[in-house]
Amino acid sequence: MRRLSRNLVAICSTLALTAGLAACGGGSDEAGDAGDTIVAETAFNLKTIDPHRQFEFTGSTIDNAIYQTALEFEDGDLTKPTDGLCSYEMSEDNKEMTLTLKDEDAKFSNGDPVTADDIVFSFERLQGIKGNPSFFLEGVKVKKVDDKTVTLTSAEPNPALPYILPNSSIGIVNSKVVKENKGTTDENDGAEQFLNENSQGSGPYKVEKYDADSQVVLTANEHYNGPEPKYKRVVLRNVSAETQLTDIQSGQAQVAFDLNADQAKQIDESMGKISSLPSTRSLYIFNNTDEKIGGPAADPNFRKAVMAAIDYDKLTDLAGKGSQRMASLVPNEFVGAVPKDEAPERDLAKAKKLLKKAGYDGEKVPFHYSSDQAVNGVDLAQLAETLQAQLKEADINLDLKPAPSSTQLDGFRSAKQPMGIGTWGADFPDPTNYNVFIPGGDVADRVNWKDDPKLKKLADEAAEAKGDARDAAYAKLFKATTDTAVWIPLVQPVSTIAVGSSITKFVSNADVSFDFAKAE
C-alpha cells in the first residue's frame, strides 16, 4: 500500500524552495523542459491503475491524482479522517456509517456529475471483483438511501472504517461509463484494461498514456472541481534509483521517489530539496514462542535480554535522517501508537542478568531475514549484520540465515523459524490493522503465539473504546505487546523524496507522498 502515519498531527511538508521556476534541461516535452510538465521517476511497482484492483505503491501514487474518495485526510493528518466527496457520521455502536454527498459540483473527466449511484457502484465493485484491496470493505453492506445518502453497515463495530475510506483503492469511478465498458460488481468484471487506458475519476488528472513497463502520462482533468493544477501534465517514468539521482541533478526530472540516504546527500541546494517523511513501515525482530522451534527465543527472559542488548540509536543512524525509534509496531503517527519516549533502551548489564535467568549459555540461535530486500533504504542484510554485532556484545550469538525474499516469507509463514527480521507496512492508518500481531492473529500464528490472557483482555477493551479513548486503549494494548518481547520494534524508516529546483512549492506528507496538483 502507500500512505499512512500516526501519533499526533500531520507530518506535512509544504515546502517553499528558494530557486526560481527555471526551465529544466532536456530535449523533449517529456524530459522536463516544458513549463507545464512535471517529470517524476520511480522504480515501478505497478500492475494496474484500475483503482479497485491496484494495491501497489506506483498504482496508488497515480490513482491519488486521478480519483477522489468519499473521505480523505487533511494535510497528512492520519489521525482524523475528514470530508472528501462526502461528509460522514458514525452510529453510536460504530456499526453504521452514513455518507452524505457533499461536493455536488464534483465532475468526472467527461463532465458527468458524481452521484450517490457512483459511490455505491464503486464500493460494490471493490467488494465484488475480489481484487487485492477487496478486504477493505469485507462484510460491509452498502445501501443507497436517497440521491445524496449512502449507508455502510457492518455486523460488528467497525470504528476503522473512516480510516479506510480515504484509500485510493476505494476511488470513486463513473459507474455509467465503466458499466458500458464491461464493468460489473462481481468477478465477471472486465473493465480493468479500459480503466488502465481511460481513467474514470473526478480528481485533478486523467490518464493519457499507460505503459506498466516504462511510463504513465497524466493530463489535467478540465472538469475538476478544485484549484487548477499549475502542471497540466505529469510524466511518471520507470527508472532505477541511480538514474533518478542523475536526472534530478541534471534537471531531467523534477521528482525522485526512491533515493536512499546516501544518494539524497548528493543533492545540494542548487539541484533541489529533499523531503524526508516518516514511512508507515515497521521493522522488527520476531521470536518464536514454541520452545521446540524457538529454543532460547521462546524464553521471555532471553527475548527481553535481546531487546535490552540492541543499540537503537545506531539503528536510526543506519536507517537515515528522519527515521524514528519505535515503542511498538504501530508507527508513531498513528492513533494507538505508544509514545517514543517509552521505546526500549540499550542496557547491556540488564541484558546479561536476563540471560542468566534464561539459562542461556551462548549457543547459536538461527536468525532469518531477506537477503535481497531493502525497506525504505534500509538493507535488511546490513541490518541483520548490525544486530549480530550488537548482540554479540551481550554474549548473544546469532547464526545468520539469509534467504531470497520469497523463500524467507514462506519460511516465516511456516511458523518454523526461531528468530528473524520482519517488516510490516500498514494497509490503512488505524491500530486495528495491527491486531494480527496479537495472540490468535494471522501474524502471531507465525511465531506460534496462541494465547495471552492479559493481551486478550486489553484487546477486548480497545475494541470497545470509542472516539478519542481509542488512542489510549490501543497504546496500552501495544505497549503490553512490546513488553512480551515476542516482537521487538527496531526502527521506523523514512521515506525520502527529492524535488528538483524548478519546483518552488510542493506538498508532501504522510498521506500523499507528493501531490502533483499542488506543485508550483
Question: Language-model features: where?
Answer:
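Aromatic- and charge-enriched surface segment that lines or borders ligand/interaction sites
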Residues: 87-131, 145, 151, 296
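N-terminal lobe/hinge region of extracytoplasmic solute-binding protein
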Residues: 41-92, 124, 200
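Ligand/substrate-recognition segments at binding pockets and active sites
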Residues: 212, 356-426
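Gly/Pro-rich hinge or "lid" segments in bacterial periplasmic/extracellular proteins
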Residues: 168-226
